[in-house]
Swiss-Prot record:
Subunit organization: Homodimer or homooligomer. Interacts with DNM2, EPS15, clathrin, the adapter protein complex 2/AP-2 and TFRC. Interacts with the Rag GTPases RRAGA, RRAGB, RRAGC and RRAGD; the interaction is most probably direct, preferentially occurs with their inactive GDP-bound form and is negatively regulated by amino acids.
Function of the molecule: May function in transferrin receptor internalization at the plasma membrane through a cargo-specific control of clathrin-mediated endocytosis. Alternatively, may act as a negative regulator of the amino acid-induced TOR signaling by inhibiting the formation of active Rag GTPase complexes. Preferentially binds inactive Rag GTPase complexes and prevents their interaction with the mTORC1 complex inhibiting its relocalization to lysosomes and its activation. Thereby, may indirectly regulate cell growth, proliferation and autophagy.
Record domain ZU5: where: 317-454
Additional remarks: Overexpression or depletion of SH3BP4 result in a specific decrease of the transferrin receptor endocytosis that can be rescued by DNM2 overexpression.
Protein name: SH3 domain-binding protein 4
GO molecular function terms listed in the Swiss-Prot or TrEMBL record: GDP-dissociation inhibitor activity; identical protein binding; small GTPase binding
SUPFAM superfamilies: SH3-domain
Cystine connections: none
Domain SH3: 55-114, 654-724
Superkingdom: Eukaryota
Gene: SH3BP4
Annotated PROSITE patterns: SH3, ZU5
Length: 963
């Protein structure tokens, strides 16, 4: 790029911070009022006595030659002067020379006139520590070796890097020049949103000056005429080693040591160790809470490695779909990206699971003067590589070639493919390209592929760029909380494509709280416009109501031009406050995008969501655990607050069909859930729906029948269905609702449960403790029977009734030992809470299966979902001890994580989940269902609920009840 383009890109003098968007306060530390007030000096201007401040770029000198390996890097020779614009990339910095810009290796350059350090002229540092962690720590404190020596906070003209704006472009905020400790004001700290996991936190030293955050460009000022070294601390770790490192080695060590500590938001999210707790119960409670926390969070780095985590919410738009030999199409939600699978893609009986995910930031390789990414990078994963056909990718891109012959002959659209996100990418021929829609056929399928579409002009010559030949659209998205509050923050994002995810995870990082939990923001609205060239954009936000205002100092943010050129997602934060918190209502936000000449490029309006309802209804998502201080704050769910509990009626089940038995069956291995019967007898069938499970040798289809006082399964081939007329040979007692209820609840007492989870669900979903107590058999007993203290809220009263049930069931003095699970489910069914019952039953089944399978869970995972060995290791990794082994008693934990993930992929049908789980267990060698038969009983239970409900509650009242 030409020098004048560089000057245009940097003429605003605004610093670029690490959050992929300029979030520095424009009004507090800058005296500039327009984009044209700062003059960019030539390299020679830095050598005069009164140099011009060089706002954004830091001058470095090359210490060795570098020949680029691709077109995104910058070529230079030893002794060349370069100007660094951004150092957030670790080993790679973004810089320019007098003709073009690109990435340079940080180890190949050295800051110019870097005198105030222990760096000698030879480029060597003596007595460095052996530990890379100490190297990184010391690099973060460079410039802080003056002990408690006071330095006047004024400007020094002999340092061209110390400008009058008092802003360090590599510091996250405006910092006064050399303040004393008592001058530090936390209110001046600029809150940032860090979205890239590679950003390091701010480090502050009490014995060092606060003008540096660890970048080697931040030079300490010295008084005029003084060039002596400042006194060095004797406890400096550089003096504790005999090893010598070169400057190049230091850069590599710094990058390596920084990587593991700043690779993720979740580096502190570690599994608890058993030795940290005094009892096994304490460790179990801590582990369950840790797993709940881990599954409710989203680590972008670990999401693909550990499929058992991060299930609650998708961060980037994704979908998983399973297709059979009939083929079909899979579309990425809320996008125009789809994959078409032809019929016969896999053999009959086989399935193909396709996973698609849109990655927001493209790799560096895809964007340059001759290339521009016009789609998100699509990650495609396939489970089955034994295929007979290719697949077709169709997507809508964010650019069209201009409608003139020269543009069409110079630039073309290309589909690129790679096995790695970072490349290298190879071209894939396009089947067709019509306007902004392209189709490409993917051959030689791999387990994981990355596909992107670019506009590419290989013959473009300087000073032209590919942007001159295309109409490139960028997408502006506005994200905010689910409900507005008296004070909240919104985020404006700029994408180089039209794939704006519905949810954006952000972490707000301040110097007081460097590692907060990420927050999920919702997409309020988005807007597309055509951008003629990559340039600095000024984004402004205004409110249409006087009650809400965007702070004057926060109304404008800047996105750098080179970010747009590289296709990086820019995220800008706008805090909004209400003048009168008592009068909250939705309002309209207007977003303006201006160019560097203050001309409005586009603007759009977005309506905000409503304030939260006054009832403060809890989210509908499942909460498995409660903290102690949250018990009194539980609010009933919307369903519970409107429920009228009907009366369970004991009467005959009338909606039965009957059949004639064609064969006599007597079983050697008795099974409570498989019926024995005599040829010629009649049998009542609860429905004609069939369940599938393994018999003595192979998988069969079964009816749920009632024969001589027992509910169980009968093989469909042994029954001739005759209709609703009761046969004369149908012996045994008549089936009533109370008998049916007692029969189908037989397996409940053999299921494992987590009491805290059950308690939370009931507190959220039952609105009347009186109805609950009556259904449990505690008829007409006062509240004082269940608790001594007076309870204020209905959820707490429900919890006290549940606690009483638990005590009675665990009381060994009772002559009749009751089952907690059975009594609870029976009471809920009598209250017509079928939706709550199936939710509890599915949780019980998954947990019980995990405990029963334990060490054989890998075999089950292979039968259910064809999980790879790497995925299995990822499920186990959070539960390994210090020796890297999962204890045999803890093996149920990865099994439970897998089953939860798998059940979410199956869908919302609790019947399908339990049916597929049963079939998967049947396929195992020496299946556990041979000895543990209660999963069969659970399958009967969930398939009989509709018949029970239809018979026990009058049809006239059904419409008044909520399940």
């Amino acid at each position: 790029m030409a020098a004048q383009r560089i000057r245009a890109a940097n003429s605003n003098g605004l610093p670029r911070c690490k959050s992929e968007g300029t979030l520095i306060d424009l009004s507090e530390g800058f005296s500039e009022t327009s984009f044209n007030d700062i003059k960019v000096p030539s390299p020679s201007a830095l050598l005069v006595d009164n140099p011009t401040p060089f706002g954004n770029a830091k001058e470095v000198i090359a210490i060795k030659d570098y020949c680029p390996t691709n077109f995104t890097t910058l070529k230079f020779s030893k002794g060349d002067h370069l100007y660094v614009l951004d150092t957030s990339g670790g080993e790679w910095w973004y810089a320019h020379n007098t003709t073009e810009m690109g990435y340079i290796p940080s180890s190949y350059v050295q800051p110019l006139n870097y005198r105030n350090s222990t760096l000698s002229d030879s480029g060597m540092i003596d007595n460095l520590p052996d530990s890379p962690d100490e190297v990184a720590k010391e690099l973060e404190l460079l410039g802080g070796w003056t002990d408690d020596k006071k330095v006047p906070g004024r400007m020094y003209s002999n340092n061209p890097f110390w400008n009058g704006v008092q802003t360090n472009p590599f510091l996250n905020g405006n910092v006064p020049v050399m303040p004393s400790l008592d001058e530090l004001n936390p209110k001046s700290t600029v809150d940032l949103l860090l979205f890239d996991a590679g950003t390091s936190s701010f480090t502050e030293s009490s014995s060092a000056t606060t003008n540096s955050t660890g970048n080697i460009f931040d030079e300490l000022p010295v008084t005029n005429g003084l060039h002596a070294e400042p006194p060095v601390r004797r406890d400096n770790p550089f003096f504790r080693s005999k090893r010598s490192y070169s400057l190049s080695e230091l850069s590599v060590l710094q990058a390596k040591s920084d990587a593991p500590t700043s690779s993720s938001f979740f580096t502190g999210l570690k599994s608890p160790a058993p030795e940290q707790f005094q009892s096994r119960e304490d460790f179990r409670t801590a582990w369950l809470n840790h797993r709940k926390l881990a599954r409710s969070c989203h680590d972008l780095d670990l999401l693909g490695q550990s499929p058992g985590w991060g299930q609650t919410q998708a961060v980037e738009t994704n979908i998983v779909c399973k297709l059979d030999s009939s083929g079909g199409a899979v579309q990425l939600p809320d996008t125009s990206i789809s994959i078409h699978v032809p019929e016969g893609h896999v053999a009959p009986g086989e399935t193909q699971q396709i996973s698609m995910k849109a990655l927001l930031d493209p790799p560096l390789e895809l964007n340059s003067d001759r290339s521009c990414s016009i789609s998100p990078v699509l990650e495609v994963k396939l489970s089955n590589l034994e295929v007979k056909t290719s697949i077709i990718l169709e997507m809508k891109v964010s650019a069209e070639i201009k409608n003139d012959l020269f543009s069409k002959s110079t630039v073309g659209l290309q589909c690129l493919r790679s096995d790695s996100k970072e490349g290298p990418y190879v071209s894939v021929p396009l089947n067709c390209s019509c306007g902004d829609t392209v189709q490409a056929q993917l051959h030689n399928l791999e387990p994981c592929m990355y596909v992107a579409v670019v506009a590419h002009g290989p013959s473009i010559l300087y000073p032209s760029t590919v942007w001159d030949f295309i109409n490139k659209k960028v997408t502006v998205g506005l994200y905010g909380p689910k409900h507005i509050h008296p004070s909240f923050k919104t985020v404006v994002t700029i994408f180089g494509h039209d794939c704006a995810p519905k949810t954006l995870l952000v972490s707000e990082v301040t110097r007081q709280a460097p590692n907060p939990a990420p927050v999920a923001l919702q997409l309020w609205g988005k807007h597309q416009f055509v951008l003629s060239r990559p340039q600095d954009l000024k984004v402004c936000m205004f409110s249409n109501m006087t009650n809400y205002e965007v702070k004057a100092s926060e109304q404008a943010k800047v996105v750098r031009g080179f970010q747009l050129k590289l296709g990086k997602v820019s995220r800008l934060i706008f805090p909004i406050t209400s003048q009168n918190p008592n009068e909250l209502s939705d309002f309209t936000l207007r977003v303006q995008v201006k160019d560097d000449q203050e001309a409005i490029l586009t603007q759009f309006c977005v309506q905000t969501p409503q304030p939260p309802p006054k009832s403060a209804i809890k989210p509908s998502g499942q909460r498995r655990f409660l903290k102690k201080n949250e018990v009194g704050k539980i609010i009933l769910s919307p369903f519970a607050t409107t429920t009228k509990y009907p009366t369970f009626q004991d009467r005959p089940v009338s909606s039965l069909k009957f059949g004639k038995l064609l064969k006599t069956v007597v079983r050697q291995n008795k099974n409570h859930y498989l019926l024995e019967y005599k040829k010629g007898d009649g049998i009542a069938l609860l429905s004609e729906e069939r369940v599938r499970l393994r018999g003595q040798l192979w998988t069969k289809e079964w009816y749920i029948g009632y024969y001589q006082g027992r509910v169980g399964l009968v093989h469909t081939k042994n029954v001739l269905v005759v209709g609703r007329a009761r046969p004369s040979l149908c012996s045994g007692p008549e089936l009533s609702t109370s008998v049916l209820l007692e029969q189908i609840l037989r397996p409940c007492k053999f299921l494992t449960y987590i009491y805290a989870s059950v308690r939370t669900l009931l507190m959220e979903n039952i609105s009347s403790w009186r109805s609950f107590a009556d259904a449990l058999g505690y008829v007409n007993l006062p509240l004082t029977f269940f608790c001594r203290a007076e309870l204020d809220s209905e959820p707490e009263r429900v919890a006290s009734v549940l606690e009483k049930l638990k005590e009675d069931c665990n009381n060994t003095e009772n002559k009749e030992r009751k089952s907690f699970q059975k009594e609870l489910v029976m009471a809920l069914l009598k209250m017509d809470c079928q939706g709550l019952v199936v939710r509890l039953i599915q949780d019980f089944v998954l947990l019980t299966t995990a405990v029963e399978v334990a060490q054989r869970w890998r075999e089950l995972a292979e039968k259910l979902a064809k999980v790879s060995k790497q995925q299995m290791d990822a499920y186990e990794s959070p539960h390994r001890d210090r020796n890297g082994v999962v204890d045999s008693e803890a093996m149920w934990k990865p099994a439970y994580d897998f089953l939860l993930t798998w059940s979410h992929q199956i869908g919302d049908s609790y019947r399908d989940v339990i049916q597929e789980l049963h079939l998967g267990l049947d396929k195992m060698k020496n299946p556990i269902t041979k000895r543990w038969k209660h999963l069969t009983g659970t399958l009967i239970l969930v398939n009989s609920l509709d018949v029970l409900r239809a018979a026990a509650f009058s049809p006239a009242d059904q419409d008044d009840f909520v399940i």
